Design a protein with these regions (language model features):
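The feature marks non-catalytic terminal segments
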Residues: 66-67, 78-83, 87-89
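Residue-level recognition of short, well-ordered coil/turn positions
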Residues: 1-2, 52, 80, 129, ...
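Thiamine diphosphate
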Residues: 1-77, 87-286, 297, 428, ...
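Core structural elements
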Residues: 9-14, 81, 89, 96
Length: 447
């Protein structure tokens, strides 16, 4: 049937809170005026007009009252929960724990990141009829402003790939209902800067559902978010939001930096029974930014899956420098991977670079092991540095690796500005880059 829109004015008939009773600020005339429009009274009248008798309605009322009393008594008499279970059910268990499939098939060809994501979703939709894609401009006519959903609408039809209104709260919040009826939604917010209207749904619904239901109602969904500064996008199309996302417990956050990781993480995110936010740097989509050519990769086979929570060493230091204690470890993600690798070229063999790939869950085992090996560490982010995820991670790792550190763990991020400027010179001044990273490496190695 067609959907119905109900536009109703509903009066407040009860107390606002137990401490602010209705009689404090409303007189009898006002209360009676609104009680005349009480939906329960109206429903009662409608049922009588429809032929239901008062005695039948009384039986229904008594049955409802009895059921409520039974449920209340059962809740009161229930045993107190075991305090040791307080951290249970933050996430539902994922079936993907090991890397699977062929990452670099011999017959494969190189693809850009945006296509790797597209191909992953196409394979998922071919295999799983419950997969559905929707968001702003992702339908067949445009296929996404970055062509990240191109051809999906033509291939799978408007009932599985469709546009939504410019309403991020709906895009995010609707996934809870979709998941409840067995659909696996893959949705998109067009730019990271526009995600904030959807945060209420991420916080109050998606992140809490598994925990509050004791694991009965996790919400499997993927929220794709193009992110990062690229080509003078300005204050409303260049933002980074990972620290804000990571303050929400109960969601997972991934941030691939190359096409192979993008495809593998997209597959793992789909099979994960929890909400997953996939941050996709616009500057890496097509490898058009100088120095990002390695974001193009051989397209992994259709069976390739990369589990969440596994960081990757993308550049290793030379063993001789390592033995002399003359190396530095850079921990980064997204565009930071390419800034770090370019900067490392000025210090051959002295720099190791780790790509986090997943920000939550995070691969603390690898990070602590490598920091203890190197003794010096720089955490690199595109976000404004102060109060960032990177600073929080630095604090955690400093405590865990304090004895083995040769210097305080350093953090490098963007300037603490409220927005990314549109002017390219100002954008460059605000953000990290390879030159700035190289200067920081030099200080770590030589001061």
């Amino acid at each position: 049937r067609k959907p119905y829109l109900v536009h109703a004015r509903v009066p407040l008939l009860g107390h606002h809170t137990s401490g602010v009773r209705k009689e404090f600020y409303r007189d009898e005339t006002d209360l009676e005026k609104h009680h005349a429009h009480d939906p329960f009274r109206k429903l009662h009248r409608k049922l009588i007009e429809a032929g239901i008798t008062e005695s039948e309605l009384e039986v229904i009322r008594q049955e409802a009252e009895w059921r409520i009393e039974q449920d209340f008594d059962r809740a009161v008499q229930a045993a107190e929960p075991d305090a040791n279970t307080v951290s249970s059910h933050v996430f539902a268990s994922t079936p993907i724990e090991q890397e699977q499939g062929d990452r670099t098939p011999k017959s494969g060809t190189k693809v850009v990141m945006v296509d790797a994501a597209l191909f992953a979703i196409r394979e998922l939709m071919n295999k799983h009829p419950e997969a559905m894609v929707y968001g702003q401009d992702v339908g067949k006519r445009l296929g996404g402003v970055f062509r990240e959903a191109a051809t999906l609408g033509d291939q799978f039809g408007d009932h599985r790939v469709f546009n939504t209104a410019i309403q991020e709260a709906y895009i995010v919040g609707s996934t809870a209902g979709m998941a409840a009826v067995g659909i696996r939604p893959i949705v998109e917010v067009q730019f990271a800067d526009y995600i904030y209207p959807g945060f209420n749904q991420l916080v109050t619904e998606l992140s809490k559902s598994c925990y509050l239901s004791m694991g009965k109602f996790p919400i499997p969904m993927i929220l794709r978010v193009p992110i990062g500064a690229y080509g003078g996008g300005g204050p409303y199309h260049s933002g980074s939001i990972e620290s804000t996302l990571l303050s929400i417990k109960g969601i997972k956050v991934v941030y691939p930096s190359n096409a192979a990781d993008m495809k593998g993480l997209m597959k793992a995110s789909y099979y994960d029974p929890n909400p997953v936010v996939m941050l996709e740097h616009k500057g890496l989509y097509w490898s058009k930014v100088p120095g990002t050519e390695e974001a193009k990769c051989i397209e992994p086979a259709s069976d390739y899956i990369l589990p969440l929570g596994k960081a990757n060493i993308v550049l290793e230091a030379d063993g001789n420098y390592l033995a002399d204690g003359d190396t530095v470890l850079i921990i980064t993600y997204g565009m930071g991977v390419y800034w770090a690798k370019e900067a490392a070229m000025e210090f051959p063999g002295q720099v190791e670079v780790i790509d986090l790939r997943t920000l939550c869950p995070i691969d603390l085992d690898l990070l602590t092991a490598r920091i203890r090996l190197h003794g010096k560490c720089l955490i690199l982010t595109e976000e404004a540095e102060t109060h960032s995820f990177a600073q929080s991670l630095a604090g955690k790792l400093s405590m865990d690796c304090f004895v083995q550190l040769d210097a305080p763990i350093q953090v490098m991020g963007a300037l603490d500005l409220p927005a990314v400027p549109m002017n390219m010179a100002l954008e460059k001044a605000m953000l990290p880059n390879a030159e700035k990273v190289a200067a920081r490496i030099d200080r770590l190695l030589n001061d």
